[in-house]
């Protein structure tokens, strides 16, 4: 066959078109003349956001060609994290999936393709970006303020320029990767450029096509007189009624190769591209968007010339055919001019068609749609109708041309080779024309060769078990069709596809059997598993070759059985050939007929050693030769006893004849040795020794907990009885002699003398030794004495397994009957989930076909990652056939458009709104995971948020999870906000959470943070405690946090005392004693002891249970408890309150503030309830372990002060400490204020905002994109300005010290006081605008480094800055926003906390010595404000004025900001609140 030099084969194709999920459905619709442009209902249009005004407009056409599932994508398959998938242009998503299907259709696995693959693709401008993603952003911020990282990332995921390179990146393609943009002709131009690339040798295979989606999707369009769109919603090319086109959505691709290369590779060829051409209209036309008939004629004529064909041989043209009154006549004019060049008369008219009548105009994908339609016409030798064609547009003058329009489906009649042209013309003038030809007969027709005899192995794989199940069902359905493909071709086609992690291998006999097997939930002929990966290397290209991972195991005496491998002998010529060769050799040496012994069992006894050992050698040797024909090679051999001779023969130590002689002699001499017996014992070799009689010896160690002993029969019998009486499992081994013991000594001399006369060679494949349990050296292999000692020495099989299982992904193949050796391997301590075992032969009790078992085992090897050459099961001329493509998961990844709010919600930096559209990518991470440090908890949360997943495996590779360089930048930026120093490069060096955590923690260790400096030292107090002792409440014992528990009356004082003892002994901070030493406070931790701080009280008589009087009595006793505490060295005090008869009792706790923060209270609450539950159940109290105690943390604090992250903030704190210009209290109006206040010198004013006022605050938060704390502080600034005066006030704020600058400690379960305190300047002015004031506070809070932890370290621990900062006056006011206090429902549990959860926030006396403490919290839908003040320093009138003015200032601030005409603030983030509070606020924000 002559092959044109410039011919290109179409070897694969795929597409999704309106009304068609794939190419097969597309042809079905074309053949049936189905129009896939649908009418949209009014409800559909309303749901899509179409207004009533538009619906009422008569110019609005309610028609559209639609694609199903444009919001769905298999993100996991392509390695996209959910969040990245959500913002990826759906045009790119569909192109990715169709590209994969096209490669599958071509039988091309890019990973195995020997050559480069190019990509030429196109997509329309991203409507998803413009309509959906950017609707969540202020257009001024996007367009007018310059490019930022988030915007760049967003455009990278959506711009058409990145379509082709995205495919190349996803599939690891190395050829040219070109995005093509010529408007409507783009996808056909892409095909042309791909052909040129193939012809020039730039690539060896190419993908070409286009993707176009109309978004919004389920909407109509507007028409107007003279426009190019149809007023009736039908595209009617060439018809007299043609009034325009209808734009639609679709995607299509073809896979191309040079024709000669495709034929040589045996590819299936759908059609042949004989030539193509492109040009441009230039300016000789009515306008930029108008067509040019002369240019169109030129491009068609040039394509004919390039193809080397005469236009008279073209019998069909797929036209651009838009159905416009202007475009169609011009196109026919150009066609007529191009075809009139021919001087050859035509035998029949040339048929015209346009797929736009079926599916509309697919914009940039229009050309590929026409090309695929035409290829299908060539394959099916038929031409579908051009819909809506009744009579020609007279402007076409078809009667003066060689053309006719196909108006109904019919055969493609042709005298010679079928040829067709495909045109595509773009707005702007780029024209393209491709000449197609039907595939050569030799390539298009399935070979008439008979189906090969015997079963086939069907291989399927998928990324998930669910996808594999869908593939099985779809394949079964395809095989059940009447004209289904040949089974051997199905197996061949599937074997050429790329393999995924979840695999299935099925041994099937015919199509009906295959369908049954595929549909069965379980079947003996099916193996389903996961590919084994090296735990260190995974899928990396530099991982060990699969042959090095494979180890062949050859069983020995005892594995034999009559009929073994009979099915293989009868059906596999290779096996039979090698069996016969060995059998002939053994017949010559021993006179034994192994055919009769093995297959019939009629000769003598296969249990006899002189029969069984030759039989095993013959079967296993033939089996190894058979598996070798399938390309399976091993990197090492282990033989068990006799099996070691088979291993050595295959490794080249013995030639076959020498091996047969050696095994024959060995078997005869062993048979002639004194009889004995053997038993397997469930004990290790050391443990079994104490039970052994004198003449019983260790014979084999198969795994560390099992061994075999051997000796005389009577002594073995006695041993069995003794072991049975001791309860030790013991079982008989099929053996007639005491093998591998000194009982074999008499034969050794004769055997060694024989071997010394034989030639032994070093092995070609490494061997493990039964004798030593390690690798055989060349010297050992060729030494006859070693082989002789093996006979009488114990087999150290467990040690051999110890060696091979040290490699993380070994594949152990038992090459022989049964599965005893692989069974021992799976019991070995080094066995792991990355190891695999495969058994090539059935167990004697299994009633299954030998060949099916063998082929299924080959399938298991393939599943484990071993390359299997399936050629022996292929027909002489295999063919690719059309089979269902990969069943991509249909998971929704979509951001709905937002038509009302432009401002971007925090956390939606990549274009998605706050939260997620479908809930599938919520990134909520539990901060209490076993085995994770605080560093890892934070990194886990950051990774989850950036990847858009709910959790991340700590050992998963960041880049395998879909991470890339841009996401690495996002993670580094997020980590910086958490106080962790990470660079994007760190993720390349440490790509797992575990390794990155270790690296981050190691950086702390380098600064002396990893270990306490002195293990036995009494630690100094941390900075916050120093602050408290230095400047806080004078009667330090009074600073207490109260908790109330309600107890079932059956709980007595012994129970309470036991619980409190357990909790106090569990948490060292609760045993804290402070000791002053020369002006320096030290912490002493008392030894665990019984809790003695429990007193007992009763509710007064006559008070009813549950009454208000009882509540008042309980609160009164609690108040007395708090007042009575004067000693700070009793961190926990408690009182039990016995209530009225039959009513609940109460337990009141008073916890010193020095040992508790919000997290500590949660820990204590959990532990107390847990301890009570265990106590009441009669169990020992066992609480969850504490990884790092308070004492250890305190020892590390000094090192934190010299950490670079803290030292880097020195200038910030020194500068800010001098900014205050206004003080609420006189510095020292009289001497007594130089001392901290006593509890009785503090008083409180309380107020509550109504639910409506609080809602106003929430509305302000949403509108201004500012945190609650920011708004409250701004209102505080206004309040101070109005009541005290204008200036800058220093305000003390709180931070969360647990989660910042984390050393290598785990504080998740540590009880202690980790709250940090730091000052910030607050501007107080009456003339400052509301938005300006909010911005000023926002920027102040945003600038605070590391939640303020560095301030305390530099103030109280680091001496150089301590002197400077200590000279500054303590801020007058302390502000604390405690967030939302939950309401606990009352229940009937025996132990439950008081439902009033405001008590621990509301009641504690301020302890930090400020003139004013403003404590704000949310409860019951209202905002509560507690103003505590030092009566010595703040006049009551001032305090009352502040309390009275604040709500008014807050309301005025919000109203003024709302009334502003525009917002000016930066909405990139909300900072400044305690971490937990910030998360609560963010989660409650509206998506828009």
Curated annotation (Swiss-Prot):
GO terms for biological process: Actinobacterium-type cell wall biogenesis; DIM/DIP cell wall layer assembly; fatty acid biosynthetic process; lipid biosynthetic process. Pathway: Lipid metabolism; fatty acid biosynthesis. GO terms for cellular component: plasma membrane; polyketide synthase complex. GO terms for molecular function: 3-oxoacyl-[acyl-carrier-protein] synthase activity; fatty acid synthase activity; oxidoreductase activity; phosphopantetheine binding. Its EC number is 2.3.1.292. Its cofactor is NADP(+); pantetheine 4'-phosphate. Residues 551-868 are annotated as: Acyltransferase. The keyword Transferase applies. The active site is at residues 184, 320, 361, 641. The lineage of its organism: Bacteria, Bacillati, Actinomycetota, Actinomycetes, Mycobacteriales. Residues 930-1004 form the Carrier domain. Disruption phenotype: Disruption of the pps gene cluster abolishes the production of both phthiocerol and phenolphthiocerol derivatives. Deletion of the gene abolishes the synthesis of phthiocerol dimycocerosates (DIM). PANTHER family: FATTY ACID SYNTHASE, SI:DKEY-61P9.11. It catalyses: icosanoyl-[(phenol)carboxyphthiodiolenone synthase] + 2 (S)-methylmalonyl-CoA + 3 malonyl-CoA + 5 NADPH + 10 H(+) = C32-carboxyphthiodiolenone-[(phenol)carboxyphthiodiolenone synthase] + 5 CO2 + 5 NADP(+) + 5 CoA + 2 H2O; docosanoyl-[(phenol)carboxyphthiodiolenone synthase] + 2 (S)-methylmalonyl-CoA + 3 malonyl-CoA + 5 NADPH + 10 H(+) = C34-carboxyphthiodiolenone-[(phenol)carboxyphthiodiolenone synthase] + 5 CO2 + 5 NADP(+) + 5 CoA + 2 H2O; 17-(4-hydroxyphenyl)heptadecanoyl-[(phenol)carboxyphthiodiolenone synthase] + 2 (S)-methylmalonyl-CoA + 3 malonyl-CoA + 5 NADPH + 10 H(+) = C35-(phenol)carboxyphthiodiolenone-[(phenol)carboxyphthiodiolenone synthase] + 5 CO2 + 5 NADP(+) + 5 CoA + 2 H2O; 19-(4-hydroxyphenyl)nonadecanoyl-[(phenol)carboxyphthiodiolenone synthase] + 2 (S)-methylmalonyl-CoA + 3 malonyl-CoA + 5 NADPH + 10 H(+) = C37-(phenol)carboxyphthiodiolenone-[(phenol)carboxyphthiodiolenone synthase] + 5 CO2 + 5 NADP(+) + 5 CoA + 2 H2O. The modification O-(pantetheine 4'-phosphoryl)serine is found at residue 965. SMART domains: PKS_AT, PKS_KS, PKS_PP. The keyword Zinc does not apply. NADP(+) binds at residues 1286-1331. This is Phenolphthiocerol/phthiocerol polyketide synthase subunit E. Residues 5-438 form the Ketosynthase family 3 (KS3) domain. It comes from the Bacteria. Binds 1 phosphopantetheine covalently. Part of the PpsABCDE complex involved in the biosynthesis of the lipid core common to phthiocerols and phenolphthiocerols by successive additions of malonyl-CoA or methylmalonyl-CoA extender units. PpsA can accept as substrate the activated forms of either icosanoyl (C20), docosanoyl (C22) or lignoceroyl (C24) groups from FadD26, or a (4-hydroxyphenyl)-C17 or (4-hydroxyphenyl)-C19 fatty acyl from FadD29. PpsA initiates the biosynthesis and extends its substrate using a malonyl-CoA extender unit. The PpsB and PpsC proteins add the second and third malonyl-CoA extender units. InterPro entries: Ac_transferase_dom_sf (IPR001227), ACP-like_sf (IPR036736), Acyl_transferase_dom (IPR014043), Acyl_Trfase/lysoPLipase (IPR016035), CAT-like_dom_sf (IPR023213), Condensatn (IPR001242), Ketoacyl_synth_AS (IPR018201), Ketoacyl_synth_C (IPR014031).
């Amino acid at each position: 066959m002559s092959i044109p030099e410039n011919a290109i084969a179409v070897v694969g194709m795929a597409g999704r078109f309106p009304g068609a999920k794939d190419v097969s459905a597309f042809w079905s619709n074309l053949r049936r003349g189905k129009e896939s442009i649908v009418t949209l209902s009014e409800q559909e249009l309303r749901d899509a956001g179409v207004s009533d005004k538009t619906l009422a407009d008569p110019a609005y056409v309610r028609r559209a060609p639609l694609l199903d599932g444009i919001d769905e994508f298999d993100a996991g398959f392509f390695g996209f994290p959910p969040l990245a998938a959500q913002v990826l242009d759906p045009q790119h998503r569909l192109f990715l999936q169709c590209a994969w299907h096209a490669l599958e259709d071509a039988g091309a696995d890019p990973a195995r393709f020997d050559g480069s693959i190019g990509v030429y693709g196109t997509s329309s401008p991203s409507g998803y970006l413009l309509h959906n993603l950017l609707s969540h952003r202020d257009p001024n911020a996007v367009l007018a303020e310059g490019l930022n990282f988030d915007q760049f990332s967003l455009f990278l995921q959506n711009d058409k320029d990145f379509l082709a390179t995205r495919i190349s990146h996803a599939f690891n393609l190395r050829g040219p990767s070109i995005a093509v943009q010529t408007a409507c002709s783009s996808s056909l131009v892409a095909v042309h450029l791909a052909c040129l690339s193939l012809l020039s040798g730039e690539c060896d295979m190419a993908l070409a096509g286009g993707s176009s989606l109309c978004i919004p999707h389920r909407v109509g369009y507007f028409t107007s007189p003279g426009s190019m769109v149809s007023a009736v919603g039908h595209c009617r090319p060439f018809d007299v009624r043609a009034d325009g086109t209808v734009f639609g959505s679709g995607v299509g691709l073809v896979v191309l190769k040079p024709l000669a290369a495709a034929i040589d590779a045996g590819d299936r060829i759908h059609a042949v591209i004989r030539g193509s051409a492109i040009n441009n209209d230039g300016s000789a036309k009515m306008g930029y968007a108008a067509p040019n008939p002369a240019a169109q004629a030129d491009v068609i004529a040039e394509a004919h010339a390039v193809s080397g064909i005469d236009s008279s041989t073209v019998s069909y043209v797929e036209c651009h055919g838009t159905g416009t009154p202007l475009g169609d006549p011009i196109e026919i004019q150009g066609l007529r001019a191009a075809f009139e060049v021919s001087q050859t008369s035509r035998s029949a008219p040339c048929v015209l068609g346009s797929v736009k009548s079926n599916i509309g105009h697919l914009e940039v994908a229009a050309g590929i749609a026409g090309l695929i339609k035409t290829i299908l016409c060539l394959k099916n030798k038929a031409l579908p109708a051009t819909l809506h064609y009744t009579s020609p547009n007279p402007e076409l003058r078809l009667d003066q041309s060689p053309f006719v329009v196909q108006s109904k489906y019919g055969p493609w009649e042709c005298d010679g080779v079928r040829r067709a042209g495909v045109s595509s013309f773009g707005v702007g003038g780029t024209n393209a024309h491709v000449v197609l030809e039907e595939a050569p007969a030799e390539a298009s027709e399935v070979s008439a060769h008979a189906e090969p005899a015997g079963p086939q192995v069907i291989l399927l794989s998928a990324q998930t078990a669910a996808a594999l199940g869908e593939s099985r069902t779809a394949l079964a359905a395809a095989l059940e069709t009447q004209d289904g493909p040949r089974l051997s071709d199905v197996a061949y086609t599937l074997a050429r596809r790329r393999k995924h992690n979840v695999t299935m291998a099925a041994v099937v006999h015919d199509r009906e059997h295959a369908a049954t097997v595929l549909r069965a939930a379980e079947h003996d002929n099916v193996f389903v598993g996961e590919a084994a990966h090296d735990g260190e290397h995974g899928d990396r290209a530099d991982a060990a070759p699969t042959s090095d991972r494979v180890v062949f195991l050859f069983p020995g005496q005892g594995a034999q059985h009559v009929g073994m491998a009979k099915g293989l002998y009868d059906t596999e010529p290779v096996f039979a050939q090698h069996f016969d060769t060995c059998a002939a050799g053994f017949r010559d040496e021993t006179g034994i007929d192994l055919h009769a012994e093995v297959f019939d069992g009629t000769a003598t006894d296969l249990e006899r050693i002189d029969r069984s050992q030759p039989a095993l050698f013959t079967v296993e040797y033939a089996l190894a030769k058979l598996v070798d024909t399938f390309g399976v090679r091993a990197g090492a051999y282990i033989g068990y006893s006799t099996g070691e001779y088979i291993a050595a023969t295959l490794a080249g130590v013995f030639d076959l004849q020498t091996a047969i002689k050696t095994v024959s002699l060995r078997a005869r001499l062993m048979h002639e040795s004194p009889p004995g017996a053997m038993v397997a014992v469930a004990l290790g070799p050391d443990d079994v020794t104490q039970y052994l009689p004198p003449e019983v010896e260790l014979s084999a160690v198969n795994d560390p907990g099992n061994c075999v002993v051997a000796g005389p029969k009577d002594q073995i019998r006695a041993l069995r009885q003794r072991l049975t009486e001791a309860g030790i499992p013991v079982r008989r081994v099929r053996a007639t002699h005491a093998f591998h013991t000194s009982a074999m000594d008499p034969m050794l001399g004769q055997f060694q003398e024989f071997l010394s006369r034989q030639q032994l060679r070093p092995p070609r494949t490494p061997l493990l030794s039964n004798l030593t349990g390690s690798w055989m050296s060349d010297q050992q292999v060729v030494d006859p004495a070693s082989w002789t000692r093996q006979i009488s020495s114990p087999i150290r099989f467990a040690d051999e397994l110890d060696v091979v299982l040290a490699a993380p992904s070994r594949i152990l193949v038992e090459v022989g009957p049964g599965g005893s050796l692989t069974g021992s391997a799976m019991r070995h301590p080094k066995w792991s989930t990355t190891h695999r075992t495969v058994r090539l032969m059935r167990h004697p009790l299994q009633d299954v076909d030998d060949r099916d078992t063998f082929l299924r085992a080959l399938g298991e090897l393939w599943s484990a990652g071993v390359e299997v050459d399936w050629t022996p099961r292929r027909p002489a001329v295999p063919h690719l056939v059309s089979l269902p493509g990969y069943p991509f998961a249909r998971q929704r990844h979509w951001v709905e458009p937002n038509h009302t709010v432009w401002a971007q919600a925090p956390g939606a930096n990549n274009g998605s709104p706050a939260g997620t559209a479908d809930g599938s990518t919520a990134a909520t991470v539990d901060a209490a995971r076993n085995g994770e440090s605080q560093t890892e908890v934070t990194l886990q949360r950051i990774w989850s948020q950036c990847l858009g997943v709910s959790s991340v495996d700590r050992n998963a590779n960041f880049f395998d999870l879909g991470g890339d360089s841009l996401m690495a930048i996002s993670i580094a930026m997020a980590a910086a906000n958490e106080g962790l120093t990470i660079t994007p490069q760190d993720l390349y060096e440490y790509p797992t959470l575990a390794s990155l955590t270790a690296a981050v923690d190691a950086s702390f260790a380098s600064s002396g943070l990893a270990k306490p400096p002195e293990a036995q030292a009494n630690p100094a107090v941390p900075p916050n405690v120093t602050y408290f002792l230095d400047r806080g409440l004078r009667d330090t014992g009074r600073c207490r946090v109260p908790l109330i528990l309600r107890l079932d009356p059956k709980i007595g004082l012994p129970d309470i005392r036991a619980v409190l003892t357990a909790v106090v002994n569990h948490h060292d901070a609760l045993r804290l004693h402070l000791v002053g030493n020369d002006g320096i406070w030290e912490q002493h931790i008392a030894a665990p002891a019984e809790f003695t701080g429990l007193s007992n009280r009763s509710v007064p008589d006559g008070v009813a249970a549950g009454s208000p009087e009882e509540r008042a009595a309980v609160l009164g006793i609690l108040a007395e408890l708090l007042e009575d505490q004067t000693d700070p060295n009793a961190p926990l005090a408690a009182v039990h309150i016995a209530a009225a008869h039959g009513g609940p009792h109460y337990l009141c706790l008073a916890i010193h503030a020095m040992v508790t923060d919000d997290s500590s209270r949660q820990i204590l609450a959990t532990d107390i309830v847990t301890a009570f539950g265990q106590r009441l159940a009669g169990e020992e109290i066992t609480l969850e372990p504490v990884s790092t105690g308070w004492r250890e943390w305190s020892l590390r604090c000094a090192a934190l002060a010299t950490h670079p992250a803290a030292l880097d903030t020195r200038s910030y704190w020194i500068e800010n400490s001098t900014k205050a210009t206004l003080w609420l209290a006189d510095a020292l109006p009289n001497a007594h204020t130089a001392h901290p206040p006593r509890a009785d010198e503090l008083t409180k004013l309380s107020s509550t905002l109504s639910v409506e006022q609080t809602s106003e605050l929430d509305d302000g938060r949403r509108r201004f994109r500012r945190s609650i704390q920011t708004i409250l502080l701004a209102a505080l600034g206004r309040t101070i300005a109005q009541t005290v005066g204008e200036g800058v006030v220093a305000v003390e704020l709180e931070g969360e010290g647990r989660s910042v600058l984390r050393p290598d400690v785990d504080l998740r379960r540590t009880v202690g006081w980790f709250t940090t305190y730091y000052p910030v300047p607050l501007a107080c002015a009456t003339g400052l605008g509301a938005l300006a004031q909010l911005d000023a506070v926002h920027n102040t809070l945003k600038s605070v480094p590391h939640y303020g932890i560095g301030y305390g370290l530099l103030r109280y621990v680091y001496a150089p800055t301590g002197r400077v900062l200590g000279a500054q006056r303590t801020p007058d006011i302390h502000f604390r926003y405690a967030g939302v206090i939950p309401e606990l429902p009352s229940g009937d549990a025996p132990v439950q906390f008081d439902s009033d959860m405001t008590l621990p926030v509301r009641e504690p006396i301020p302890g930090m010595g400020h003139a004013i403490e403003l404590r704000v919290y949310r409860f019951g839908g209202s905002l509560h404000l507690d103003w505590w003040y030092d009566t010595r320093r703040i006049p009551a009138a001032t305090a009352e004025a502040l309390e009275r003015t604040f709500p008014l200032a807050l309301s005025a601030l919000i109203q003024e900001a709302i009334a502003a005409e525009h917002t000016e603030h930066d909405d990139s983030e909300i900072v400044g609140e305690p971490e937990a509070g910030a998360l609560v606020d963010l989660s409650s924000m509206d998506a828009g």
